[in-house]
């Protein structure tokens, strides 16, 4: 269920200097990207969504899309089942030991052996590997259905620290990690009240200033980030490999990283 409704960069009025700097760079960036896309990637659009307290021009990218991640995971699980691959859920791997041509995988309750081990636990990987990766918790909420919602597409706010999109007639909004970096450097799921409150304020004051809305669900997710934006895809040894540090782009680049990881054998 992929929809290419485009992506929009939004700038609050306090960031008007940043918007103007980005606007000045558009031609340069489009020139760099044109060989890949055969047309300009970024253009200026009017604010047609009724957003408030923002610069009244948006930077639009027609190539960004929306994916139903639940349907994506369901399709991947079906594909795995057809190949008779067994999935063990909710098993906490604590360590691994290499034994010549095999790997012993140690969990909280039992151990088992495998000829190869691929580690793709992203933000949880620093429990097993000595790599430059930091867990980063992301706060998310989603509204109940909103009558006559006129917002369609994906949107980035405040240098990308906030992301929102429509899911049918709901708004999903996440981000705000920059409000509390240290507390959110964790692999423990949980809500941060400060950030969740800010997400609601952004909904009320910027995204949906004319709409009544209620929050339906709140949750958190764990990303894997680092000082570099590139993912780590490499062999740790002859039998152990990793594909980690996806930098908050897991849905977008996860399948590519999976292919690269498979090619490591």
Please place each PLM-identified region on the residue numbering.
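Flavin (FAD/FMN) cofactor-binding and adjacent substrate-gating region
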Residues: 1-75
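A short, glycine/Asx- and small/polar-enriched loop/turn
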Residues: 49-55, 97-104, 225-230, 236-237
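C-terminal catalytic lobe of FAD-dependent flavoproteins
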Residues: 57, 63, 209-265
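Flavin-dependent oxidoreductases
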Residues: 95-172
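Glycine-rich nucleotide phosphate-binding loop and flanking beta-alpha elements
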Residues: 16, 124-126, 179
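Short loop/edge segments at beta-strand edges and connector loops
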Residues: 4, 89-91, 217
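Helical element adjacent to the flavin cofactor pocket in flavoenzyme catalytic cores
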Residues: 54-115
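Active-site lid/adjacent beta-loop-alpha segment flanking the redox-cofactor pocket in flavoenzymes
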Residues: 149-237
